Amino acid sequence: MFAFTDHKAFSLLFLLFFSLTATAENTSFTTTHFSGSGNCSDCHDGITDDLGEDVSIVQDWSASMKANAAKDPYWKAKIAAELKRNAHLAEVINDKCTECHAPMANYESDGKAEILGDKGVLDPSHPLHDAAMNGVSCTYCHQIEDDASLGTLDGFSGNVEISDGKVAFGQY
C-alpha cells in the first residue's frame, strides 16, 4: 500500500506531466524510415463525401489514442512511477513502452529510446521528440510488413516488422 508521501509524489508527477501535454511538435518531420503525419495531411485531409461530410482519416486519427499515445498524461505518470520503482529495469521499460507509445522513435533508436529525463524522447530538445510525440502515426502503420504474425497474438505489443523501402502500404 502507498504511504501518503507516495500518493503526493505521484499526484505531483501526474500534474507535471499533464501540464506538459500541450508541447507542440513538428508533425512535418522526416527521419530515416518515417515521415510525420503533417506530411500525409496535405493530401489526406479535407476529404468530403457526396453529402459534404468530412471523411478525412487525418481528422479521425488526430483525436485517436494512436495519435496521442505519447501525450497521455496517465501513461507518462505510470512510466515515471515504474521507472522509479524499478530503476534496474529502466532499459526494458523504456523499450517495451516506446514500442507502442512512441514506435517511430523506438524504431529509429533501435529500441534504445529513453522516455523521460534529459535524454528522453519526451524532451523537446531530443532529436526524436517529434517522432515520439506523433504517436502511432501514418507511416509507421503503413510500413508494417505483411507477415505471418500480423493480426495474431504474436504480432501484438509492437512485435511487427517495418519495411525499409519507405513504401506506404494500404489499406492498413
What residue ranges belong to the model's regions?
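Hydrophobic h-region of N-terminal signal peptides that target proteins for export
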Residues: 15-24
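Sequence context of c-type cytochrome heme-c attachment sites
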Residues: 24-134, 146-172
